[in-house]
Amino acid sequence: MIQVLLVTLCLAAFPYQGSSIILESGNVNDYEVVYPRKVTPVPKGAVQPKYEDAMQYELKVNGEPVVLHLERNKGLFSKDYSETHYSPDGRKITTYPPVEDHCYYHGRIQNDADSIASISACNGLKGHFKLQGEMYLIEPLELSDSEAHAVFKYENVEKEDEAPKICGVTQNWESYEPIKKASQLNLNYQYQRYVELVTVVDHGMYTKYNGDSDKIRQWVHQMVNTMKESYRYMYIDISLAGVEIWSNKDLIDVQPAARHTLDSFGEWRERDLLHRISHDNAQLLTSTDFDGPTIGLAYVGTMCDPKLSTGVVEDHSKINFLVAVTMAHEMGHNLGMRHDTGSCSCGGYSCIMSPVISDDSPKYFSNCSYIQCWDFIMKENPQCILNKPLRTDTVSTPVSGDELLEA
């Protein structure tokens, strides 16, 4: 008994290495078991909320102690954020849950100026962070010890499919000449634009996740949490206006032909979704395997158009941020961005608007994307992204459980 107790204490105090494990993110060849310790100070006598606005965790990565600083992503949800699903007889059910006390965070690693983090703290810590130039994933382990987490490098996750994955947008536009060079675009937060996004989840996704709507919503929330961080450097603020789950059946003809699905989705958005939810852009998340290597498709330079401010994204990976980057890529097309060429750069990393998803996880938009996005905004002046949406943390929200049933 004493020997068992000593072993347990040692495991709780020190991380240990594992050679191979199957996690939610996939098969991992090399991982580290860690026990993140929350060190956020709480004033004496104060009641500690479930999710603070700011938190700090100590953990060990590669045997070295690090401090993870997290701040709640307060602008993640729009004021009138809604969730819609469908009953077995096809009735539309819409709720307006209170989301100001949510569990999604951005952050950084202490003493690493180039570090970033996008973390869900809903059930343990789950997400990704960049440390000393390398991307790491963290997720809770399903052990009797609920504090145990796995930390592993992105490169140590076995690839689900070695075939290249691409965006279906082709370079068939007219010759493009930007109005300014990057050095001439001296933008600041006075130029900020605001995109309110609705993510629609098809019936195949509902089946793929075994009808677990909460798990689907958490998947989408974490995706948008990552997208918001990527767009922050572009002076584009992303907020989630709604999640709609086609829990009964698909409301459009979802096909492996991505262009057909995109056209169908855009038409449905114009005649249906826009009349129910105020938003600027809609993205369809589907379990359908698109033809060929395509994992996403969107119209170019169409933000604010009733039909064309849309994209379709295949749920192509168990790693959340890879699907999030794909959705950020497709929305980038809506904002006028083209695919990066060899002359484009984003600080030595793989860029979000690369036409091919590389093994080096994309993190940033390139200098080309920056110019193209703001060239589109300055020339076309899309009106719907000018207004700053009210945030859920600054206004009252409908009472939990408010529900609308529609025939």
Curated annotation (Swiss-Prot):
Post-translational modification: Contains sialic acid terminally alpha(2-6)-linked to galactose in a complex N-glycan chain.
Residues the record marks as carrying a glycan: 367
Stretches assigned to the Peptidase M12B domain: 193-389
Active-site residue numbers: 330
Localization: Secreted
Gene Ontology CC: one annotated term: extracellular region
UniProt keyword list: Calcium, Cell adhesion impairing toxin, Disulfide bond, Fibrinogenolytic toxin, Fibrinolytic toxin, Glycoprotein, Hemorrhagic toxin, Hemostasis impairing toxin, Hydrolase, Metal-binding, Metalloprotease, Myotoxin, Protease, Secreted, Sialic acid, Signal, Toxin, Zinc, Zymogen
Quaternary data: Monomer.
Top-level taxon of origin: Eukaryota
Tissues showing expression: Expressed by the venom gland.
Name of this protein: Snake venom metalloproteinase ACLH
GO molecular function terms listed in the Swiss-Prot or TrEMBL record: metal ion binding; metalloendopeptidase activity; toxin activity
Job of this protein: This zinc hemorrhagic metalloproteinase has fibrino(geno)lytic activities. It causes hemorrhage and has myonecrotic activity on both fiber types I and II. The recombinant enzyme, without post-translational modifications, also has proteolytic activity, but does not show any hemorrhagic activity.
Binding site for Zn(2+): 329, 333, 339
Signal peptide residues on this chain, from the entry's feature table: 1-20
Disulfide bond annotation, renumbered to this chain: 304-384, 344-368, 346-351
Propeptide feature: residues: 21-187
Gene Ontology BP terms: proteolysis
Annotated cofactor note: Binds 1 zinc ion per subunit.
Principal localisation: secreted
Organism: Agkistrodon contortrix laticinctus (Broad-banded copperhead)
Pfam annotation, one family: Pep_M12B_propep
EC number: 3.4.24.-
Binding positions for Ca(2+) per the UniProt entry: 196, 280, 384, 387
InterPro entries the record matches: MetalloPept_cat_dom_sf, Peptidase_M12B, Peptidase_M12B_N, Reprolysin_adamalysin
Cofactor(s) this protein requires: Zn(2+)
